[in-house]
Every structure is written in structure tokens, then in C-alpha cells.
Amino acid sequence: MFDFMMLEKVREKGPLVHNITNIVVANDSANGLLAIGASPIMASAKEEMDELAKMADVLVINIGTLDGELVTAMKIAGRAANVAGTPVVLDPVGVGATSYRRKVVQELLAEIQFTAIRGNAGELAAIAGEAWEAKGVDAGVGSADVLSIAEKVANEWSTVVIISGEVDVISDGTRFAKVANGSALLPRITGSGCLLSAVCGSFIAVQDDAFRASVEACASYAVASEYAEIELERKLPGSFRPLFLDALASWSVEKTRAKAKIQESGEHK
């Protein structure tokens, strides 16, 4: 079902990805998007959100480092993107960590129709109202079924859900896929999940089926990380980061097809 040609579409079209993101990851996200052939813009002034919504091919909202002005900009941008027909991706970083983050995400979900939501299991469990022990912005631990969480959030908010982890889970509420790829070094570099949200956004920008786009984005991203790890002399995060950027830039459809481990099903049983 997956031919992994969306990567070539991203390179061909160079979608403009508007990121309202956090101060920790902005540089890495921009460079990662450039590496895959997308065109990033990192803008958060509320005064220009309406204009950017008409220009951008996708909007990616990341709540990693929040403040009141930024939240206002997110809401303006998201509403304007909905009016313009621009897809919107939410990365609810650390939503389960504080009551303020939970409040902001609930407001965003109430005011904006999101095409996709990408986060770790703890973040999506918080949105689903499932018990989970959050650990700051990390996944933490919990016993809830990840597929059930994905299904619940996808159906409640009419969106595609991407839950990142050792095995990524993607669902639109009726279709489900698991991607069992990825380097163990990815969680050891800050912002790897945030960049994945932006990469998912760039794939969604060139494909009407957000579920298919998200599965291909996750698989391609994870396979690239595996190739980066192969090039390492020492399995250390500082050495891995630049090699991963290079791997993103040298992605090929053939490499992804050769290594992607995708399990797809039509329903969650």
C-alpha cells in the first residue's frame, strides 16, 4: 500500500511549513525541514498569522515553550489556517506535565480543527483522559493500550493521531498502522519528536490522505535514523545528530522501501 513516493513529492514541491514552535528546537526543526526539501518559516508574531495562513502549505503548532502571547498567536494562526483550508498539525509537548499545558491544549482543540496530532504515549494519554504518569515532556509510564488511546483521540477530535515510541502507532480512528523502525539514539537528542511533527506536516502538505502521509513520514524518518546510526563510529548522541541531518538529506525511496517495517490493519481489535 505504501510506495514511499511522498518523499519525492516533498522534494519536488518544497512545501512551505509554518512552524510555531519552541525555542529549544527551532533551529534543528528548520534544518531538518530544509534537509528533506521542505521550506520552513519559523514565525510567531500574532500580527502576521492571518497572512501566513494564506501563504503556508501546512501549519505546525508546538507547545514546548509556552507563554500567553504565543498561545494567542497559535489560536489566530490555527483559525486562519482552517478558513484557508491549510492543514494543521499539533505537537502537544508535555501536555500532561502541568495544568496550564492541559488547559492550553484543550483550548486549541476546541478552537482549531487539527489534521494530525503527534506526540508520545504520555501526551496522547493526557489528551484522551487516560491514567499515565508524566515525566516532564518525556513519555513517562502507563498501562493504557496505546492503540486504544490513538483510536479514542482520533475519533473524538476527527484527526490523525501519531504516537511516537519504540514502535510508532498511527490511526485515523478506523485505520491503524505500526512502524517498527528507528534508532535507539533518537530519544537521546532533544527535539527529535518535534522535528518528526514538522516532517509529518510536510508530507501531509503534499498528500490529501493524512493517514497515509503520516505513516510514510514516520517510516521514512525512522529508517533515516537507522542509516545515520550505521555511520557512527561511537554510539553517542553528539555524533549522531549531524549524521542524522545528513541522512535526512540523502533519503531515498529505495532505502525506505528496503528497511521499512510497517504493519497495517483496518480496525483495532
Curated annotation (Swiss-Prot):
Keywords, sorted A to Z: ATP-binding, Kinase, Magnesium, Metal-binding, Nucleotide-binding, Thiamine biosynthesis, Transferase
Positions bound to substrate: 42, 191
Pfam families the record matches: HK
Cofactors, names only: Mg(2+)
A single BP term in Gene Ontology: thiamine biosynthetic process
Enzyme Commission identifier(s): 2.7.1.50
Listed GO MF terms: ATP binding; hydroxyethylthiazole kinase activity; magnesium ion binding
Pathway recorded for this protein: Cofactor biosynthesis; thiamine diphosphate biosynthesis; 4-methyl-5-(2-phosphoethyl)-thiazole from 5-(2-hydroxyethyl)-4-methylthiazole: step 1/1
InterPro entries registered for this protein in UniProt: Hyethyz_kinase, Ribokinase-like
Main enzyme class: transferase
UniProt-annotated binding residues for ATP: 118, 164
Catalytic activity field: 5-(2-hydroxyethyl)-4-methylthiazole + ATP = 4-methyl-5-(2-phosphooxyethyl)-thiazole + ADP + H(+)
Family statement drawn from the similarity comment of this UniProt entry: Belongs to the Thz kinase family.
HAMAP family: Thz_kinase
Function: Catalyzes the phosphorylation of the hydroxyl group of 4-methyl-5-beta-hydroxyethylthiazole (THZ).
NCBIfam families cross-referenced by the UniProt entry: PRK09355.1 (NF006830), thiM (TIGR00694)
Designated name of the protein: Hydroxyethylthiazole kinase
Source organism of this protein record: Listeria innocua serovar 6a (strain ATCC BAA-680 / CLIP 11262)
